[in-house]
Amino acid sequence: MRRALLLAAVVLAGCGSPPPDLFLVTRSGPDPAANLTMLVSDGGSVTCNGKEHPLDADRLLTARQLQRDLAKQAELGIQLPQGANGELAYKVRMEAGSLTFGDESAQIPKTFLRLAAFTADVTEHVCKIER
């Protein structure tokens, strides 16, 4: 009986906790629509500039993979300067650490480009922010 009560207490303690965040992207650029704060939650939602939207399963799986793929680079705190012709700057925070880069950074890793593409896709198609 005591064991059952302990198990029930452990299960209930986890109930009601919000799902963890996967990552936070802050994007800045020359026009108002370029400036964005996007928080992706493991619970299947994304918050763009303070407004929450549901995130479909495919995009959620993509976000989870991006988090895994970017973890080592975030742990290192990689900061790539913006290139001469760049427009958009990205700051990414996640549990593993943070990273910064620009859309025209030299020697930009493919994972950073995938994150930029994911951000553009979610911003336009989920959050309905046209750039």
Q: What are the language-model segments listed below?
A:
Residues 31-37, 85-87:
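Short, surface-exposed coil-to-beta transition loops
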Residues 16-22, 26, 73, 77-131:
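Short, well-ordered, aromatic-rich surface patches in folded extracellular/luminal domains
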Residues 34-61:
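Post-signal-peptide N-terminal segment of Sec-exported extracytoplasmic proteins
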Residues 51-81:
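Mature extracytoplasmic domains of secretory-pathway proteins
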Residues 12-14:
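C-terminal motif of bacterial Sec signal peptides marking the signal peptidase cleavage site
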Residues 1-4:
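Positively charged n-region of N-terminal signal peptides that target proteins for export
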Residues 32, 55-58, 103, 107-110:
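Extracytoplasmic/periplasmic, Sec-exported soluble proteins
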